[in-house]
């Protein structure tokens, strides 16, 4: 029995044996290329996967692959040729026991191939699909199985480019969005000008965040964070590289009253445990 599920569902059978697994690699051109501090995204790739157990139950998962976009096909091939064969026709007690076994099995390969990120992302996608499978099989929404209570998730408009950012926010507002996230980490003056223009036009019920995408050094972040505190920001995302020592994140937290966000570039359960325990990371 997994310790991840809600106590009210402890009688649900979480065991499974996968007999089929299929990757789906997709790509859609972006009408407006998305500019980030690490490069420009000209299309939106995606890698999905479907697993089927020995009773015909199915689950869906997704593998991170947004940049560089050529990584989508690579992750699809990793799933098909490396990860899926280790999964097939074996009996697992639960998705988390399978996750632990796959992590252990491929730890050496991740080092040998120099690909800890892609391998971890593929295993994570399988984990999502397996949890989806056992939840669907039990007839329980996955968020409830894992202890969630709210089916509604607020959405925000992301990927807002530095060029014409205020006009982009206006368009997103017209489409119904009330929360917006701007890409920064370019030139400091331009970033601050965009932030000032957007925050000046925010409505009372609107939320605004910025995403640095790990662009700053610690010194650059320490110099810039106090200026950002003058604006109404819900959070500042990844001001420095995600794997920097906790002492550096703590120094940033002391330099600003704005919450700091991170997480999308953590690739192991241990990374997330450390991230959650850091008093510097609020989101």
Each language-model region and where it sits:
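Short coil/turn connectors at secondary-structure junctions
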Residues: 55, 140-141, 150-155, 175-177, ...
């Amino acid at each position: 029995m997994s310790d991840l599920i809600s106590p009210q569902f402890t009688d649900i059978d979480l065991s499974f044996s996968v007999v089929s697994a299929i990757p789906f690699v997709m790509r859609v051109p972006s009408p407006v290329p998305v500019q980030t501090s690490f490069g420009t995204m000209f299309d939106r790739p995606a890698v999905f996967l479907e697993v089927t157990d020995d009773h015909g139950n199915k689950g869906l998962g997704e593998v991170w692959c947004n940049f560089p976009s050529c990584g989508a096909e690579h992750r699809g091939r990793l799933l098909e040729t490396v990860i899926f064969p280790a999964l097939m026709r074996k009996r697992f007690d639960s998705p988390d026991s399978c996750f632990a076994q796959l992590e252990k099995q491929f730890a050496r390969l991740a080092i040998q191939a120099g690909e800890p990120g892609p391998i971890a992302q593929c295993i994570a996608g399988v984990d999502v699909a397996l949890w989806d499978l056992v939840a669907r099989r039990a007839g329980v929404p996955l968020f409830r199985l894992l202890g969630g209570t709210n089916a509604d998730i607020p959405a925000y408009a992301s990927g807002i480019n530095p060029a014409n950012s205020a006009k982009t926010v206006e368009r997103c507002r017209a489409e119904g969005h009330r929360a917006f996230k701007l890409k920064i980490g370019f030139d400091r003056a331009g970033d601050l000008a965009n932030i000032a223009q957007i925050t000046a036009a925010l409505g009372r019920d609107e939320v605004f965040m910025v995403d640095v995408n790990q662009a700053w050094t610690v010194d650059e972040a320490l110099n810039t964070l106090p200026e950002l505190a003058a604006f109404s920001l819900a959070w500042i995302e990844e001001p420095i590289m995600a794997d920097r020592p906790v002492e550096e994140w703590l120094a940033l937290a002391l330099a600003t009253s704005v919450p700091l966000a991170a997480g999308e570039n953590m690739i192991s359960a241990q990374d997330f445990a450390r991230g959650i325990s850091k008093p510097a990371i609020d989101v």
